[in-house]
A protein has these predicted regions:
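Bacterial N-terminal signal peptides that target proteins for export
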Residues: 2-16
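C-terminal motif of bacterial Sec signal peptides marking the signal peptidase cleavage site
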Residues: 23-26
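Catalytic loop of the DD-peptidase/beta-lactamase superfamily, centered on the K-T-G motif
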Residues: 31-89, 98, 230-232, 244, ...
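Active-site-proximal loop and beta-strand segments within enzyme catalytic domains
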Residues: 73, 94-214
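Structural recognition of the beta-strand scaffold that forms the well-ordered cores
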Residues: 76-79, 101-103, 109, 148-151, ...
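Secretory-pathway/luminal and periplasmic proteins that interact with or process carbohydrate-rich
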Residues: 86-87, 138-147, 155-162, 232-235, ...
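Short, well-structured active-site flanking segments
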Residues: 116-137, 229-256, 304-310
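Catalytic-site signature segments of enzymes, centered on catalytic residues
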Residues: 160-260, 276-290
């Protein structure tokens, strides 16, 4: 029952008691004299409790989106502020427990893991040092820093050069070259694949800090460097710095790229957990990603544990991709900076998932999609969420007087 409903019932019950009391007085015996009239009783009900934002129009837009497409059987989203979940809704065949492949919406949690490792006083690791500081081998990319890699400014060719990363047809393992980072086959090992990436220079490589070039090998090298520095697997680091303190249920990294449609929604069906793909291999449910977004809104906390400093959170939002000379794009570390919607940062994925925070309003959200076939227009849900849903969410938030 709503607070308003409780207040109204309470007011009604008070008036009924007063009415019953007046009837008892009227029915009482007595002599011929009359008593002075009692002063009127004035009841002032408490003002109604403030109501939260009304996201019904946002819900309706999600329903309209899913009704208007044959590509997707379900969609869901969750909104948070610094205190917790403020709204969530599922549509179609989605439930609150639906687990999806995140693709590039893995990037923000990956950066969170790296920043938390940097803050760990028991591990020698800095995103500002060349990766060769920590790796037991040299190579053309050993002089690049993790900070440059996770801001897509390392000079290592990104996904634009994917066709020249290697040959998935072999005939030898070496022919895979940089494509080893996208394989869940047990013949590929996480750290040895990282060594392949560092030591095999790609065409059109540039000096660090000159150009923005999204995704690819630079992200994998960053994750491998962290694992070597900490003497731990990547998923051990994710569990140590995010999973355990935040109480995450399913969040983990694998490597589904060779056959994403083989993922059934269960953790057990996720391929490649021993060779996880850093930039795009994570899975999550709504509750887990909601907790990760809260960290960016409450000063770095999961419950009573601070998993990231405010300085690290702020550093992730600083534009690094938009200040280079070539192909400049407003990008922090993991976050795309939405210059057309000030204060909004997003992390969209190839399968259609998107996360966002609005630092001006202190809110954030995550949208889940679970259609991984080639026939699905994964750009449609991303465009819908960023261009339509987020502005509608902001309007509902503002209308509530926040």
């Amino acid at each position: 029952m709503s607070n308003d409903g409780f207040i109204n019932l309470r007011s009604i019950s008070i008036w009924l008691l007063l009415l019953a009391f007046s009837v008892l007085i009227g029915c009482g015996g007595g002599g011929g004299g009359s008593s002075p009239a009692a002063p009127p009783v004035v009841v002032n009900p408490s003002p109604p409790e403030p109501t939260g934002p009304d996201f019904s129009d946002v819900d309706a837009s999600f329903q309209a989106f899913i009704d208007g497409t044959s590509d997707f059987d379900g969609i869901s989203y969750v909104l948070v502020d610094a205190e917790g979940v403020i709204h969530q809704k599922t549509f179609g065949d989605h439930t609150e427990d639906t687990v999806v492949l995140l693709a590039s919406t893995s990037k923000v949690p990956a950066v969170m893991t790296l920043m938390a490792l940097q803050e760990d006083p028991e591990v020698t690791f800095s995103i500002g040092e060349p990766v060769g500081t920590y790796l037991p081998y040299d190579g053309p990319y050993a002089d690049r820093t993790v900070e440059q890699m996770i801001s897509n400014t390392s000079g290592i060719p990104g996904l634009r050069l994917l066709a020249e990363y290697g040959s998935p047809a072999g005939p030898s393992i070496e022919d895979f070259n940089h494509l080893c980072q996208y394989s869940g086959q047990p013949i590929f090992e996480f750290e040895s694949c990282g060594q392949t990436l560092v030591q095999n220079e790609l065409p059109t490589s540039r000096p660090a800090g000159r150009a923005y070039d999204y995704g690819g090998s630079q992200w994998q090298i960053a994750g491998v460097t962290a694992s070597v520095a900490a003497n731990a697997t990547w998923n051990q680091l994710v569990d140590r710095y995010l999973g355990t303190p935040c109480g995450l249920e399913v969040f983990t990294f694998g490597n589904p790229w060779e056959s994403p449609t083989s993922f059934t929604g269960s953790v057990e069906s996720l391929a490649g957990t021993t060779n996880p793909n850093i930039e795009g291999g994570a899975i999550t449910n709504m509750a887990d990603y909601a907790k990760l977004l809260q960290v960016h809104l409450n000063g770095g906390f999961c419950e009573d544990t601070q998993v990231l400093s405010e300085a690290s959170i702020a550093s992730m939002q600083v534009d690094r991709g938009g200040v280079v000379a070539t192909n400049a794009k407003p990008y922090g570390m993991g976050w795309w900076i939405q210059t057309s919607n000030p204060g909004v940062l997003t992390d969209p994925g190839a399968f259609g998932a998107v996360s966002f925070i609005d630092v001006n309003r202190g809110i954030g959200g995550y949208m889940a999609i679970d259609e991984y076939g080639d026939q699905a227009d994964s750009g449609a849900p991303r465009a819908f969420f960023i261009d339509q849903a987020i502005p509608a969410i902001q309007s509902a938030w503002d209308a509530a007087g926040n």
